[in-house]
Amino acid sequence: RLDSIYDNPEDDDPDVEVELMKRGINITLGSNDLFGSGSATLSRKGRGIVEEITATLTDIVSDYHLTMDVEGHTDDVPIRSFRFPSNWELSASRAANVVRKMTESGGIPKEQSRAIGFADMRPKIEPRDSTGALVRGARDANRRVEIIIHY
């Protein structure tokens, strides 16, 4: 069952990356498919992606008593709305909504799950080069949710 996580997820969705790390398994989801701009509500496609990942991970996390962190990351464009005064709130809310979806209906155990918001503090790609120019594709890459299954 664990092998199914590695079976070319990029073939199904180019915004899903799976990587084996020292700390565990890291699944990176591009947030453009998960959420609308400035929103923390999972889109229909986002719900489907999260449900599929949950179906694959539930037995692994439960049977082996592993822990799961869901990290929300944003780009460096500030958000200022009533609901999200900054990217901190947006990233935390996105992570929480993914955890909620993964733990509802007896999925991943709640007590083995954490939601963490990083805003734009841990970019996958630095948004600007040494001259201060925007790096093409950096903002898209930095808007993401990472699911880390700790060994």
Residue ranges and their predicted role:
Residues 28, 34-52, 56, 73-151:
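Periplasmic OmpA-like peptidoglycan-binding domain that tethers envelope proteins to the cell wall
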Residues 1-66:
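Periplasmic peptidoglycan-binding/tethering modules of Gram-negative envelope proteins
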